[in-house]
């Protein structure tokens, strides 16, 4: 079941692993992405911002192992840099699952402007992937944003 990012635990919360997985689920989707580290956020942040917004949980492997990613200075700097490069203001939380620290990046849905990657691509979150808009899809998307 898909949970909106506002259903995630509060900053500083501590959960048992079973409660965490029950809350967020193990499947990535439009509003949830798992990443082991903060190294590859430059596509995920703008894609989520141009979709429904969502949460990026750092410290979880592709196999859904809890590897851990504390909210240390390096992690915060990487998150801030990626968000700043695409002009999105994100919120950051640190939670503990079992004894494992995880960092959650909360990405807002942006409706009043276009957000691109630092290299100018317009991405949307489709399922569990970040997909580029191409051709006529770009103009339709931009026109829809201007109408609302």
Name the predicted role of every residue range.
Residues 1-148:
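Conserved N-terminal catalytic/coupling substructures associated with nucleotide/phosphate chemistry
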């Amino acid at each position: 079941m898909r949970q909106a990012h506002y259903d995630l635990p509060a900053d500083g919360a501590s959960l048992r692993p079973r409660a965490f997985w029950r809350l967020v689920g193990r499947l990535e989707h439009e509003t949830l992405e798992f990443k082991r580290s903060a190294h590859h956020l430059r596509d995920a942040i703008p894609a989520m911002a141009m979709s429904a917004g969502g949460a990026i949980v750092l410290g979880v492997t592709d196999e859904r192992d809890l590897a851990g990613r504390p909210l240390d200075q390096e992690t915060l700097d990487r998150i801030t840099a990626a968000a700043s490069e695409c002009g999105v203001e994100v919120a950051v939380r640190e939670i503990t699952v079992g004894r494992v620290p995880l960092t959650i990046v909360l990405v807002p849905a942006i409706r009043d402007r276009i957000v691109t990657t630092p290299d100018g691509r317009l991405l949307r979150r489709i399922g569990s992937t970040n997909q580029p808009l191409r051709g006529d899809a770009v103009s339709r998307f931009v026109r829809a944003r201007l109408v609302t």
